[in-house]
């Protein structure tokens, strides 16, 4: 399986502050050396990742109208607590997940980047809505054309605005990614600077492409609920 290796770049003075490269499974080489110890490490990674993915604490942060849909997921109708993400934190130092919901203006970009840097590892980012993904309909000087220009993004949620169910699906996709990640199990001091291995996830558009092409008879508007 292919992974994306992310390492901090101490020489970078502007974003991106990390270096990325596509590598093979980091445990495969160790399996050939010592099956027992590598298997034990694999079990520890799975247990730790299970705890991480089921206790993702979002940072209470919104920049535009998509935040209304984000707040709707916290109601009893959608019950975000099913995924362990109902603990909304007011401080980035206590949060694991930043959901950028809405337009990222140029004046807001330094604030978003500073808040992201204040979050402790491990941390993840969900870009919610067309404006956060690519600037949306605001192709103007005052809007950043995608929040991934200033911080790394793990999951993109399309829509203007996306429905709460779309954000819940994004959270489920993020949980799948977290389960397959490979991070240091403790603090790492040295040249590696805590490398992070993230799996290369297939976009939902590509995953469902064959299924959608196979559809010949579309449902009428009366049948869609």
From Swiss-Prot:
The reaction(s) annotated as catalysed by this protein in its Swiss-Prot or TrEMBL entry are: a quinone + NADH + 5 H(+)(in) = a quinol + NAD(+) + 4 H(+)(out)
Q: Which residues bind [4Fe-4S] cluster?
A: 65-66, 131, 160
Which membrane topology describes this protein?
A: Peripheral membrane protein
| Signal peptide location | none
Where's it mainly located? membrane
Subcellular localization is given as: Cell inner membrane
The note describing how and how many cofactors are bound reads:
Binds 1 [4Fe-4S] cluster.
What EC number(s) does this enzyme carry?
7.1.1.-
Which InterPro entries does the record match to this protein?
Answer: NADH_UbQ_OxRdtase-like_20kDa, NADH_UQ_OxRdtase_20Kd_su
Q: Which PROSITE patterns match?
A: COMPLEX1_20K
EC main class here is translocase
Task: Name a GO CC annotation attached to this entry.
Answer: respiratory chain complex I
Mind listing the UniProt keywords for this protein, alphabetically?
4Fe-4S, Cell inner membrane, Cell membrane, Iron, Iron-sulfur, Membrane, Metal-binding, NAD, Quinone, Translocase, Transport, Ubiquinone
Q: Name one GO molecular function term.
A: NADH:ubiquinone reductase (non-electrogenic) activity
Q: Name one Pfam family in it.
A: Oxidored_q6
Q: Which cofactors must be present for this protein to function?
A: [4Fe-4S] cluster
A biological-process GO annotation: electron transport coupled proton transport
**Source species, domain of life:** Bacteria
Q: Which family does it belong to?
A: Belongs to the complex I 20 kDa subunit family.
State the protein's purpose.
Answer: NDH-1 shuttles electrons from NADH, via FMN and iron-sulfur (Fe-S) centers, to quinones in the respiratory chain. The immediate electron acceptor for the enzyme in this species is believed to be ubiquinone. Couples the redox reaction to proton translocation (for every two electrons transferred, four hydrogen ions are translocated across the cytoplasmic membrane), and thus conserves the redox energy in a proton gradient.
NCBIfam families in the record: nuoB_fam, PRK06411.1
Assembly and interactions? Answer: NDH-1 is composed of 14 different subunits. Subunits NuoB, C, D, E, F, and G constitute the peripheral sector of the complex.
Name the record gives this protein: NADH-quinone oxidoreductase subunit B
